[in-house]
Amino acid sequence: MQVGWRIGNLFGIPLFLDSSWFIILLWATYVNSQYYQQEWGSFLAWGAGFVIAILLFCSVVFHELGHSLVAISQGIKVNSITLFLFGGVALIEGDHRTPGEAFQVAIAGPLVSLVLFFLLGLTSLLFPTSSLIGESINRVAEINLILGIFNIIPGLALDGGQVLKAVVWKITGSRFTGIR
C-alpha cells in the first residue's frame, strides 16, 4: 500500500500517509476532545484531542514497526508502513519459512501495543489523575490496550487471524489450511 505521501523512514522502512488518514485524524481529534470538553473548555479539549490523536497514530506506527522489525530479523523485506483510515499496514514482501516465524511476526504488533499500554499506564501514575497530562497519557494507554486486544481477534484481516493461521499451519503442516 504505497500510496499517499512519504513522510520519512524508520529503520530504513519508508513511512507513508494515505490521504484517508486525515479523515480519521479529524475524527479521533473530535472524539478525544469531547472527552475533555466540560472539564477543560474548548481550546484545551481540542488541543488534547489533537495530541491524543497524533499519539494514537504514533502507537499504530510502533505496532506496525513491531511486525516489521521481527520480519526484518527473519530476513524478510519490509517495503513500507502506511497509515490510513483503518489504522496502519506494514507491507511485508515474501512468505515466512516456518509457522513459528509467521506467528512471531503476527504477534509482535499486538505485543508492542500491550507493552505501550503497560508503560504509558505506569507513566500516567507520575501525574495527578485530574491533570490534563495524566489523563491524556492514561487515555493513550487505554487506546493501546484496546488496539492490542482488538488485533488479537482471530479474523484474517487482523493480527489474530494471522496468529491463528500460523497455529493451524503448525498443527496441520499445511500453510493454506488455516485460510480455507
Q: What are the residue ranges of the model-derived segments?
A:
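Hydrophobic transmembrane alpha-helices and their immediate loop junctions
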Residues: 1-180
